[in-house]
Curated annotation (Swiss-Prot):
This is Large ribosomal subunit protein uL13. One of its GO terms (biological process) is negative regulation of translation. It comes from Nostoc sp. (strain PCC 7120 / SAG 25.82 / UTEX 2576). Belongs to the universal ribosomal protein uL13 family. InterPro entries: Ribosomal_uL13, Ribosomal_uL13_bac-type, Ribosomal_uL13_CS, Ribosomal_uL13_sf. GO terms for cellular component: cytosolic large ribosomal subunit.
Length: 151
């Protein structure tokens, strides 16, 4: 019987990455970010442990979607009160709270348990081009979301 390798938690190196979301496709960007948060890009990935890195997303207000999703994709939230369902299109939510779009997409790609909540805290999303995490010396991460494109 094979045993699952357990890396010592103190030996884990947690890197910080910064991702520019300008003109990136939302779903493809979110899936790459979720893989980094989980640590699936590392050799010592363990499914039930937090082995991932921190990710900073800048320019979330410039994220792109294809087709008619800008006007037809709906985001729903509920206040908890009777009749409290609110519905908003992608375009309106992008004007009001652009960070929430990226957060919602990434959160849906993480595990639905306490580990997923812990992983989600390592995601930092900002609408503009600046972020307050310069002290962590984040590395630039270029994610290609358009198949066949070089940018």
């Amino acid at each position: 019987m094979s045993k699952t390798y357990l890396p010592p938690q103190e030996s884990l190196e947690r890197d910080w990455y910064v991702v520019d979301a300008t003109d990136k496709r939302l779903g493809r960007l979110a899936s790459e970010i979720a893989m980094i948060l989980r640590g699936k890009n590392k050799a010592h990935y363990t499914p039930h442990l937090d082995t991932g890195d921190f990710v900073i997303v800048v320019n979330a207000k410039k994220v792109a979607v294809t087709g008619k999703k800008r006007t037809q994709k709906l985001y729903r939230r509920h206040s908890g009160r009777p009749g409290g369902m609110k519905t908003e299109t992608f375009a309106k939510l992008q004007q009001r709270l652009p960070e929430r779009i990226v957060e919602h997409a990434v959160k849906g790609m993480l595990p639905k348990n306490s580990l997923g909540k812990q992983l989600f805290t390592k995601l930092k999303v900002y609408a503009g081009p600046t972020h307050p995490h310069d002290a962590q010396k984040p590395k630039e991460l270029n994610i290609h979301t358009i198949p066949g494109a070089e940018s």
